[in-house]
Amino acid sequence: MKTQQGLSRRDFLRTGSASMLGLALSRLVPFAARQARADAAEISGAPQYDDWADVYRERWTWDRIAKGTHHVNCWYQRGCNWNIFVKEGLVFREEQAADYPQTNPDVPDYNPRGCQKGACFSHRMYDAGRLQHPLKRVGKRGEGKWKRISWEQALEELADATIDTIREYGPGSIVWDIGTAGTNGCSGLGIVRTCNVLDTPFLNANADIGDHHPGAAVTLGKICFASSADDLFYSDLILIWGGNPVYTQIPNAHFINEARYKGAEVVTIAPDYNASSIHADIWAPVNVGSDAALGLSICQVMVEEGLHDQAFIREQTDLPLLVRRDTRLFLRQSDLEEGGSDDVFYFFDPVAREIREVSQATLALEGIEPALEGEFAVATRDGEIIVEPVFAGLKRQLADYTPERATKISGTPASLIRRLARKIGRAGAATILTQSNFSKFYHGNKMERVKILVLALAGQ
């Protein structure tokens, strides 16, 4: 009997038997091959592997997984979370933990954090060039002759020398140079604690290597002041000015791209078309070391075109404060009263037509709009003088930094300077992303102060 497809019962059984035999052979042949390999391995002593992947499985085994991080690699917001794979007491692999919780559902999370510098940190830890034992100089200074000594001898000699020096010359005669490696973690805390107990000074590692941001320090009182990196997601204009975060801020750089996907415009101001420039909407070239001229020109355009935020300037900056035209110093209470304070300053109230003390309790102006321009006569203890707001002097100084003049210094096209100024002045939430570049320049403090001025004029 044949089916509708023309296949008889005998044909069906013959075909089915052949298929089942093929399936059986397909399982028997690999088993036989594996058995042959096992027999050969037993004879030769070679390891047994079912396939190439077993080689890696055998290699990547570990006793435990510890937690760790790496200090100072990125300067800002470092300390990425890493899983440390330990075998026989040695670190042999590091992997990003990538377990940061999302703190705000409207903002991208921090994951994964970490970069190739952290992934190879253990290589540095076990590098052959790393000093692992105390060495004592046995030749003349600079001769390069050393001998290995025990930890006991090293600590004893250091302690004796410290005690003798303090007794003879005082604690101020001992200076600790802890270096960047000692700025964080247990080693750094131990050194600082020792210095405090002994009353001995230690050098600032940031100043040693030019990471101390002197412009920010003298203008704002500290060198680190910023929101977390994910706050970039709220920016509509990001200026990468003084850094290359795609290379040097790898764990946080993804927030720049995510903000850009959201609609933010990214501008990189740099001498070279670097990795961060590639991922920017605009690259603004600038000659090395001329950023102050570029920044002042941006400020000049903002003031000339009325893009500066006058309400912000009046309340949040010292630009309304009165300055003496004769000494270029702030007008102080001590100028007006016998025994007056040196830290009480004044602004001019154009409605009341008189000077007023700047409150030391609040920034709120309570409806008063201090004058930003003009000259005013003030009676002091030494006679009448002329004063003006800081902003008036600033505006006069900025007149020398038109884009046409600044381009000769900075190399940035005048049209691009105006374009940048208008973007910054009209931005709703502009951010300048900077790093530790300008601290290493002569007059780098001026470059940092100018960037702060740009943001202040823009009300940012």
Which sequence ranges carry the predicted segments?
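N-terminal export/assembly segments and adjacent metallocofactor-ligating motifs
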Residues: 2-376, 383-386, 405, 413, ...
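Short acidic (Asp/Glu) and glycine-rich catalytic loops that position anionic groups and cofactors
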Residues: 170, 274-280, 396-402, 426-434
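Residues that form generic nucleotide/phosphate-binding pockets
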Residues: 134, 161, 301, 397, ...
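A glycine-rich, hydrophobic/aromatic-adjacent loop/helix-cap motif
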Residues: 404, 415, 420, 424-460
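A charged, amphipathic alpha-helical module
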Residues: 389, 393-419, 423
